Structures are given as C-alpha cells and as structure tokens.
C-alpha cells in the first residue's frame, strides 16, 4: 500500500531511469556492500528481494501503465500530453474552419449574414468553395500552440496544486483543483494563441485583406503594430479562461459520473474503446456548457479584431448586451460541442496509443493516496 506521504514528494524525485545522481548512489552502495562481503568470514544472511531493492535505490518509482515505459507525471508524460494537445486542438479547429468562418461573419455583419444557411450560401456565392477554408493556416498554427500549452500545463498544474493541497484537501476539493489548474494553463495558452487569432479574424472577416497567414501577418503588423497582435488578449482571456475552466472541470465531473452511474464496471475493467467513447460523450456535453459561458467574450474578440481602433465600449454599444449573449450562439453550441468532444477523444486516443490512461474517472494522485491510506 502506498503511503500518503509519497504523493507529497516533488515529482522530480520520481525516477524510472538512472540519473547521474542515482548512478553515483548506486556505485557507493554497491561498493559498500561488496566491501562488507569481502570482510565477512562466512556468507551473509539471505536478504529478501524487498530489502535488496531498498538498498539499491531509495528513490520512489513513479507509477507506470503496464507494458509501456512512460511514467505518470514524468517529463515524458508531460511531453506526451503536450503533443496530444497539439493534435487535439490544432486538427479539430482547422476542420471546423467553415463553421468558424460563418460564425465570425454573423457576429461582425448580422445584417448580411442573417442565419447559418444563408451565411454558407453567401460565402459560396462570393468566395467559392475555397472561401470556406480562408484562414485555416493561422487557425492550425494558433490552436496547435494553444493546445500544447492548454493540455500540457493543465496536467502539470493539476498535479502541482494537488501536491500543495495534500491528499485530504485534494480529495475534498478536487473540483477546485481542476478549475485552478485549467485557469492557470489557459493564461499561458492564450499568450501563444493571441497573435494568430488576431490575424485569423482579420483574414476571415475582410476577404480583401490578405490570402492567409504568410501575407496577412506582415500586413497586420504594418497596420496595427506588434502591440495590435495582443489588442484582443484581455477579451481572449475573458472568453477562453471561463471556457477552459468549464471544459476541464465539467469534463472530469461528467466522466466520473458516467463511470459511477451509467457503466456497471469500474473504469479499470472497461475496454479502451469504451473509455474513448466516454471521453467523447463527456467532452461533447462539456462543450455545450463551454459555448454558453464564453460566448459574450467571443463576440467581443471578433468585433475588436475586425475593426482598427475598436474598443470594448464600441462593441457593447453596437452589438448590445443581449446580442453579446445570443448573436451566433446556436452555431457556436454545435461547433464547440462537436469540437470539444473530438478534442477529448483525440487527446485520450493519443494517450492510450503511448500507453497512458484516459483522462477522468479517477481522483488526482494525492486523493488516491488518501483513499488507499483509509482502506
């Protein structure tokens, strides 16, 4: 049984491979053991395997998924989560570029783009099929960078805050751990996303502005300056931080409830296919909540990045408070629900591919230790 104190030891002390320090320790311990054996006139008492292991290395091994070599909460674990985030966010956002394009234009020019169907019709008539994928390069690059930071730092902050809180408080306030970890990760992720988002919106809502990222980026800088790339950072935080807090906390809670009430077997006994299905379902429901919570700020981001010198006050005056909450919302619910479900499905599929467990359905590490200690 694992001691609850083990989870409070910093993650850098977990080891599965020999570091220079552990190698030196092994050499010292081995030399001492050999010297004692040579001085002994008779064979030493037979040691148990456990005692031999404890003499060889006193560092605590981090848990691993059977059959694979990636330790939980090791640098390789965070690298895998980071790469999974790149795949899940970059590819999914690029795929829904046509929906995003119509949504942005409905927010900017509702008199022209009155509905989803008419919006697609207008784009097809004016720009052709190619017009549906205008801005896909900044979308792919921006959301790949955001996904890397979002998922990688979420796993890091979730573990860090769990360690700081300790087993008892982590078990009691795990939702707060999810909220704090996701908010911290999104602050960093949006700094990476913001320049790409600014260019993307300008390219998508002003067809004559630029063809894409290669010519749009220098044109934007020439027009707005480098500071203009981060003009929408505060509204972007206002959109993405509540979105991500809802995305991760609700997903973790929904998945836990699915395994608790809808599936008769524990998660550990479910097939990987079923676990990935749960990830998609939990992600889709979480995405609906995300869209509702973050939609007013999404309207602000689109408005500010579309017009030079525009302010939040201008946006509120032109769109109105009701419009901030409702303009383009049905399309965004469909888009974000599908997007979030696909993101969690892809992210967990990659984790399974590299031998890691899927996300959710279990408590954070210190909380698990506390449960085991009470058993």
From Swiss-Prot:
Signal peptide: none annotated. Induction: By salt stress. InterPro entries: Mitochondrial_sb/sol_carrier, Mt_carrier_dom_sf, SLC25A3/Pic2/Mir1-like. One of its GO terms (biological process) is mitochondrial phosphate ion transmembrane transport. Coiled coil: none annotated. GO terms for cellular component: mitochondrial inner membrane; mitochondrion; plant-type cell wall; plant-type vacuole. Expressed in stems, leaves and flowers. Strong expression in vascular tissues. The chain crosses the membrane at residues 76-96, 135-154, 176-196, 232-251, 273-293, 333-353. Its main location: mitochondrion. It comes from the Eukaryota. It is a multi-pass membrane protein. Residues 97-134, 197-231, 294-332 are mitochondrial matrix. Residues 155-175, 252-272, 354-375 are mitochondrial intermembrane. It is found in: Mitochondrion inner membrane. Solcar repeats lie at residues 76-160, 173-257, 274-353. Keywords: Membrane, Mitochondrion, Mitochondrion inner membrane, Repeat, Transit peptide, Transmembrane, Transmembrane helix, Transport. GO terms for molecular function: mRNA binding; phosphate transmembrane transporter activity. Disulfide bonds: none annotated. Plants overexpressing MPT3/PHT3;1 display increased sensitivity to salt stress. Transport of phosphate groups from the cytosol to the mitochondrial matrix. Mediates salt stress tolerance through an ATP-dependent pathway and via modulation of the gibberellin metabolism. Belongs to the mitochondrial carrier (TC 2.A.29) family. This is Mitochondrial phosphate carrier protein 3, mitochondrial. The gene is MPT3.
């Amino acid at each position: 049984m694992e001691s609850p104190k083990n989870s409070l030891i910093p993650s850098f002390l977990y080891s599965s491979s020999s570091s220079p320090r552990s190698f030196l320790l092994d050499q010292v311990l081995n030399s001492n053991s050999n010297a004692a054996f040579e001085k002994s006139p008779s064979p030493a008492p037979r040691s148990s395997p456990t005692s031999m292991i404890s003499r060889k290395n006193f560092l605590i091994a981090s848990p691993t998924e059977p059959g694979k070599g990636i330790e939980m909460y090791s640098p390789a674990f965070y690298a895998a989560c980071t790469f999974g985030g790149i795949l899940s966010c970059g590819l999914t956002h690029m795929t829904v570029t046509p929906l995003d394009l119509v949504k942005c234009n409905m927010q900017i020019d509702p008199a022209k783009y009155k509905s989803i169907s008419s919006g697609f019709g207008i784009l097809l008539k004016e720009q052709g099929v190619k017009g549906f994928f205008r801005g896909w390069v900044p979308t792919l690059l921006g959301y790949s960078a955001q996904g890397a930071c979002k998922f990688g730092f979420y796993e890091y902050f979730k573990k860090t805050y769990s360690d700081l809180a300790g087993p008892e408080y982590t078990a009691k306030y795990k939702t707060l751990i999810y909220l704090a970890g996701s908010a911290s990760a999104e602050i960093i992720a949006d700094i990476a996303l913001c320049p790409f988002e600014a260019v993307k919106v300008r390219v998508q809502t002003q067809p004559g502005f630029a063809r894409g990222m290669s010519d749009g980026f220098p044109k934007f800088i020439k027009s707005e300056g480098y500071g203009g790339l981060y003009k929408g950072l505060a509204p972007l935080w206002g959109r993405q931080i509540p979105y991500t807090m809802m995305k991760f906390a609700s997903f973790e809670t929904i998945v836990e409830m699915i395994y608790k009430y809808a599936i008769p077997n524990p998660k550990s006994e479910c097939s990987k296919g079923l676990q990935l299905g749960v990830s998609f379902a939990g992600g889709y429901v979480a995405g609906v909540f995300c869209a509702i919570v973050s939609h007013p700020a999404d309207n602000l981001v689109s408005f500010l990045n579309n017009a030079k010198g525009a302010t939040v006050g201008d946006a509120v005056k032109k769109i109105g408070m009701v419009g901030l909450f409702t303009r383009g919302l049905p399309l965004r619910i469909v888009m974000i629900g599908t997007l979030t479900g696909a993101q969690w499905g892809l992210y967990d599929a990659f984790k399974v591919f590299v031998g890691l467990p899927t996300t959710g359905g279990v408590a954070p590490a210190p909380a698990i230790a506390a449960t085991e200690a009470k058993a």
